């Protein structure tokens, strides 16, 4: 039996490799393995908890320099005294807000995920972009199409 979904996943994984977007390629390959093995019974759990677990892991990665001491408290304190750091803080707040909107929109309109994934891969492949922020991208989409 011909599995169109598997073919689409393989195509997206290939685009990930072609565009040097290892994160997307590996993620899709993991999902392919889950799909073609008995692990597929975990898809409901992955769909329900995957985004939250991913955000937790991402937050751990972002906070690690503070926890390890690589980013000393003095640097954090000085970030409130420099105008460039204040701009960075403001942008961080805006991006976090957009990411929150993105999570909401991805949950209510999951059909957007494929378009965002293709757009991310094309941006990396054609414009030497960096594959960051599908949640932020979805947040921007929510500003255009409305948060539903």
UniProtKB/Swiss-Prot annotation:
Query: Which residue stretches, if any, does this entry annotate as coiled coil?
Result: none
Q: How does it sit in the membrane?
A: Multi-pass membrane protein
**Assigned keywords, A-Z:** Cell membrane, Membrane, Transmembrane, Transmembrane helix
According to its record, what are the GO cellular component terms?
Answer: plasma membrane
According to its UniProt record, where is this protein located? Cell membrane
Q: Which Pfam families match?
A: DUF441 (PF04284)
Q: Where are the transmembrane segments?
A: 14-34, 51-71, 86-106, 112-132
Q: Report the main location listed first in the record.
A: membrane
Q: Please give the family membership noted in the entry.
A: Belongs to the UPF0756 family.
The entry's protein name is UPF0756 membrane protein YeaL
User: What organism is listed for this UniProt entry?
Assistant: Escherichia coli O157:H7
Q: What is the lineage of its organism?
A: Bacteria, Pseudomonadati, Pseudomonadota, Gammaproteobacteria, Enterobacterales
């Amino acid at each position: 039996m011909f599995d169109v979904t598997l073919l689409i996943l393989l195509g997206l994984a290939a685009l990930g490799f072609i565009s040097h977007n290892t994160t997307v390629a590996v993620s899709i390959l993991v999902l392919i393995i889950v799909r073609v093995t008995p692990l597929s019974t975990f898809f409901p759990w992955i769909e329900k908890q995957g985004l939250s677990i991913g955000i937790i892991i991402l937050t751990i990665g972002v906070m690690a320099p503070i926890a390890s001491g690589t980013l000393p408290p003095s640097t954090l304190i000085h970030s409130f005294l420099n105008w460039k750091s204040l701009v960075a803080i403001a942008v961080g707040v805006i991006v976090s807000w957009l990411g929150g909107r993105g999570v909401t929109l991805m949950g209510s309109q999951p059909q957007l995920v494929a378009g965002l994934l293709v757009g991310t891969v094309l941006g990396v492949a054609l414009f030497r972009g960096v594959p960051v922020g599908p949640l932020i991208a979805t947040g921007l989409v929510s500003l255009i199409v409305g948060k539903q």
